[in-house]
A protein has these predicted regions:
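Blade/loop signatures of beta-propeller domains
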Residues: 32-84, 236
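Conserved beta-propeller blade signature
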Residues: 105-109, 116, 154-156, 200
């Protein structure tokens, strides 16, 4: 059996200790983001109606769409002392979304239905979702105001006219429903909202063809469509007379 001389033995012990320290460091780095995912709590209807000050659960923050945060740590007396904590390169394209935040995780909906989840404290990536691209006829279809957190889901409305539910801790699709036809220009530009367990969305892109758009409600757990209403009434429908003698095929508009 070979015997290490004292120098080699000390070198071996030193390398082993360094390797162990490196492994512990890597394990700790991996454990931190995993702990965020493990500790994620489902978003309730009560939280959607009255979000915690530290959270931003939908595009405009609250159901009334005020886009106002009650946080007061940053004010006119200290705003000039703000410094960059971390930065993140977004997907190229038109950006009209706002980051969503819950339990220390920041969700970044971006152009053309690309979603990333990161550690809000330092930007460490947690997962990403990239929807297949389509050759859309609507030039603004990649620009949307997307995303609502509910239960353990991130619910988005896409440029190819689908509503999609992603698992908030993995980015995996839990359900998706086709609502319109992207090949004729229909798409979602506004994000979904959740009320009483229903996902409410309004279709866009109907100005490209002779038809009106609509608003739909879907079961948040399954995506099943529960009701649909046209935003432009047809002849014989309630308020249809408000369009006078305009035929149905010329009654069109967005939602």
């Amino acid at each position: 059996m070979p015997v290490l001389n004292p120098f080699n033995r000390r070198l071996s012990i030193g390398l082993t200790t360094a390797a162990a320290a490196l492994l512990l460091s890597i394990s700790a780095a991996v454990a931190q983001p995993q702990a965020l995912l493990d500790n994620y709590t489902p978003v309730t209807l009560e939280e959607l109606a009255n979000p915690p000050a530290s959270d931003w659960l939908m595009w405009r923050g609250t159901p009334n769409n005020w886009a106002h945060s009650p946080l007061d740590q940053i004010n006119k007396d200290n705003v000039d002392s703000l410094r960059l904590a971390w930065s993140w390169t977004m997907e190229p394209g038109k950006q009209e979304t706002t980051p969503l935040v819950h339990d220390g995780i920041m969700f970044l909906p971006q152009a053309c239905d690309f979603i990333e989840a990161v550690d809000a404290t330092d930007g460490t990536p947690l997962w990403e979702y990239r929807r297949a691209t389509v050759d859309h006829v609507a030039p603004l279809s990649c620009a949307n105001r997307n995303g609502t957190l509910y239960k353990d889901q991130l619910i988005i409305a896409t440029r190819d006219a689908f509503i999609v539910s992603l698992n908030a801790t993995s980015g995996e699709v839990t359900w998706e429903q086709k609502i319109g036809d992207w090949t004729v220009g229909q798409h979602y530009s506004g994000g979904p909202q959740v009320f009483n367990g229903k996902v409410i969305t309004g279709m866009s892109g109907c100005y490209y063809i002779n038809t009106s758009c609509w608003i739909t409600a879907h079961d948040a757990d399954t995506g099943e469509e529960l009701w649909r209403t046209n935003t432009v009434p047809k002849i014989g429908e309630p308020n249809g007379e408000s369009w006078g003698d305009v035929p149905n095929e010329q009654r069109r508009g967005g939602s």
